[in-house]
Structure formats: structure tokens, C-alpha cells
Amino acid sequence: MITEALKKVIEFKDLDEKEAEAVMKDIMSGNAKPTQIAAILTALRMKGETIEEITAFAKIMREFSLKINPNVPKLLDTCGTGGDNLNTFNISTATAFVVSAYVPVAKHGNKAVSSKSGSADVLEALGVNLNVPIERVKESIEKIGIGFLFAPHFHPAMKFATPVRKELGIRTVFNVLGPLTNPANANYQLMGVYDEKLTEKLANVLKNLGLKGALVVHGSGMDEITTIGKTKISELRNGEIKSYYIEPEDFGIKKAKLEDIRGGDAEENAKIIGEIFEGEEVGAKRDIVVLNAAFALYIAEEAKDVEEGIKLAEKSIDEGKALKKLEDLIEFYREG
């Protein structure tokens, strides 16, 4: 099947849903040779992947993943694409703990691909054991309100594509598929993307995948809601998608410079997150976490608007709730 699909894609013709599903099934089941995987990924990148193709790929990846179904009323993920190459600290990981004081979070993530520190790297540096059984992850979401879904544990079929991705060294559709394939089936999502042009497209994919609410965001070169300039947001709510731009000043947050929110390696980023949660860092780094958490609480229908979300996010940090969630997760996974 992959050969027929390749013939089509190199002529810049789009795959229909069934064809795209068959391609991903071939890759995930080990039926596609590495050269074929490299060829189809490169051809798709040159053609430009459609909403229908990305949706089909994500559905099959979800089928091949190991899944958990935490017994919680709502579930949020803050997983983004990464790959913005700006070397900020792990904002979406810090955001996950702040938000988990109010909404259960299934944080999907991995080790760094292009940055110095992925979410898994910084969590390890903070003392979180990544090698826990997946059932333990389900329990931590139910009992603590947060769990970390380490991608390699939940997506074993990715072993066929990962070496090819590394050797290719270019962005492919897999860069966006990670955040679209939460193994706990989170029904709300704050998803940062590395390119502003992707926000509407991926909001449509999340709609096709059945999410209740999602914000797909890109902020002035960052795969986060930014405080250094404008952020483009595509919002999925009640089956409708609308796009708009925001700036930090709209919400009374001071504009920052990129150097104010830069991170370093995993150890340095863990130190920054600790300082935010312990109340030692009260400047730009805290501000950007608060703003992202506020939008996450808004889209998860926990805050009626972003302003209320900001108050809740500040309370989570100031009252030590975010720090407690981190400490509880470290302890819970240590036993695992």
C-alpha cells in the first residue's frame, strides 16, 4: 500500500482517509521498509499534509498505542510539538502542575529531540521516575490529579519510525502527531505548535478526533502562549473553531524579552521550575507559566475567562498547590 500512496504523493496528490490509514498501518506494524518510510514522510512534507491525512494518521497511531482510561470527569493535556529552537525553559511542563490543582492532567511527553531539554528530561531532573508501569500512571491521574505519559512506553510501534526520523533530521508529520495521540484520551488540550500556519489545521484535526475543547497556539516563534509578543490562537469550543491574536498586556501581564524566559539543560530548567513553585521566581518566568495555565483552565471550562484563570493559576503557585502536586508525583512514582 505504501508504494501506491508514494506514487500519488510525489505527484502532489492528497491521500484520502483510507489510503492515509493504510500507510500508517504499514509503518506501525513494521510492514514498511525504512527507505519507504523515509520516502513517504519526505514526500508528504513537500506536498503539505492535509487535515484528513493528519487525522487518519493520528487515529491509527492511537489504535496502535497502549491506552489508559483514568476515571476522572475531565482530562487535560498540555503537550506541544516542541521544536521552536528558542531554548526556553519547559513552560508547558510547569503549566501542567499549576493546572493540576484544579483539573486532572495527563501530560504526554518525551525526551528532547531538537531542544536541550524535553518534558521527560526535566521531570527526571526534578526526581520523577519515568519507568513506572502504565497502570501506575492511570492511578496517579486519579489519586493525585496528574500523570506523566512517557511516549516510548505508550507508543511501542513507533520503534519502526523513530530511527528513520532521527536519520532524516527534518520535520515530518510525526512532529505534530505526538501531541495528537494522547494515550489517556484527554478531552481538553493546550497544544503549542512550532509554526503559526499550523494552528487552524491542527485545531481541525483535534475536532475530528473528538476533543471537547482545545487551544492550538503559536507565540512569536514559540510553541507556547508567549509574553514576548503576539500569540496566535485557534480555539476549538462547542465544535466551532475561531482564531485570534492576543498579547500579554491584554491581561495585565508585563511584556518580556526572550532572554528573560530562556532556560538551559534539564538541570537548569528543573531549578527554574522549582524556583517558580517555591515563590523565589516572581518575574517573567512565573508570568509566562501563569498565562499558559490561565488559558488551559479557560479551555478546560474550569475558569469562565482568562482573567479568572490567571487568578486561579496565581493561587495554585502562591498557596503551594503546584509544588505539592510535583512532590506528590515524585513520591507516587518512586513507589512504582
Swiss-Prot record:
UniProt: Mg(2+) 1 binding residues: S92, E224
GO cellular component labels: cytosol
Catalytic activity annotation: N-(5-phospho-beta-D-ribosyl)anthranilate + diphosphate = 5-phospho-alpha-D-ribose 1-diphosphate + anthranilate
Keyword Hydrolase carried by entry: no
Coiled-coil portions: none
Keyword Transmembrane found: no
Binding locations of 5-phospho-alpha-D-ribose 1-diphosphate: 80, 83-84, 88, 90-93, 107-115, 119
Names of required cofactors: Mg(2+)
UniProt-listed Enzyme Commission number(s): 2.4.2.18
Reported function: Catalyzes the transfer of the phosphoribosyl group of 5-phosphorylribose-1-pyrophosphate (PRPP) to anthranilate to yield N-(5'-phosphoribosyl)-anthranilate (PRA).
NCBIfam families the record matches: trpD (TIGR01245)
Protein name in the entry: Anthranilate phosphoribosyltransferase
Organism of derivation: Methanocaldococcus jannaschii (strain ATCC 43067 / DSM 2661 / JAL-1 / JCM 10045 / NBRC 100440) (Methanococcus jannaschii)
